[in-house]
Amino acid sequence: MEKEKLLYEGKAKKLYFTDDSEVLWVEYCDQATALNGARKEQITGKGALNNQITSLIFEKLNAEGLETHFIEKLSKTEQLNRKVSIIPLEVVLRNVVAGSFAKRFGLEEGIVLQEPIVEFYYKDDALDDPFINDEHVRFLNIATYSEIEFLKSETRKINEILKKIWAEIGLTLVDFKLEFGRLADGRIILADEISPDTSRLWDANGQHMDKDVFRRNIGDLVETYTEVLNLLENAK
């Protein structure tokens, strides 16, 4: 597999064409962002940690029979992905009250929800990724109602697998963000990444093991992510 010209550069990744039109070469970068990109910082080692964590998680999801874009890890900072057209939605699932959800409803963080809540956010930096509902998704021609139901059900299925993965290493999956994409034949599959950048994880003492250590200036991001990676590797 040969890496070719740059296709896209985002906040945390660079995507390259390959000599296979259906495969992308993905490089994870060291940039950390918060406040929807308003705060940016280069943190040496972050890209390698996220790539390795994401690779381990996606390997487990693939083994469970879920269809994802992940093919294989190439190096500490690189992986191969199936080429998809990203659906402009952030699909967020919440198991525990935290973050913006707590602020929106005036609740204390840490309340366990009776059942998981799935939310949609429209991926648009200029609009600050607004919270939207099913009808908005249809109005914007992002997805059909049947596709919306698939996104919800697939996210709930993924949640059950992820909760077990994280629980095995002593972490609670508080909430997380997923992105999905369409293959050339129109099928929708899981894409993007699953890491402490996109998940809120708490240990048994309530310590944050995710990007909140950067967002809230409460810890060292590299040390935290390294601990998460070590826990996952030791659980293999």
UniProtKB/Swiss-Prot annotation:
Catalytic activities: 5-amino-1-(5-phospho-D-ribosyl)imidazole-4-carboxylate + L-aspartate + ATP = (2S)-2-[5-amino-1-(5-phospho-beta-D-ribosyl)imidazole-4-carboxamido]succinate + ADP + phosphate + 2 H(+)
EC number: 6.3.2.6
A biological process from GO: cobalamin biosynthetic process
InterPro entries, sorted: SAICAR_synt/ADE2_N, SAICAR_synt_PurC, SAICAR_synth, SAICAR_synthetase, SAICAR_synthetase_CS
PROSITE patterns: SAICAR_SYNTHETASE_1, SAICAR_SYNTHETASE_2
Primary enzyme class: ligase
Recorded metabolic or biological pathway in which this protein acts: Purine metabolism; IMP biosynthesis via de novo pathway; 5-amino-1-(5-phospho-D-ribosyl)imidazole-4-carboxamide from 5-amino-1-(5-phospho-D-ribosyl)imidazole-4-carboxylate: step 1/2
GO MF annotation terms: ATP binding; phosphoribosylaminoimidazolesuccinocarboxamide synthase activity
CDD domains, alphabetized: SAICAR_synt_PurC (cd01415)
Pfam families: SAICAR_synt
Keywords: ATP-binding, Ligase, Nucleotide-binding, Purine biosynthesis
Gene3D superfamilies, sorted: ATP-grasp fold, B domain, Phosphorylase Kinase, domain 1
Record-linked NCBIfam families: purC
HAMAP family membership: SAICAR_synth
Sequence similarity: Belongs to the SAICAR synthetase family.
Entry protein name: Phosphoribosylaminoimidazole-succinocarboxamide synthase
Gene: purC
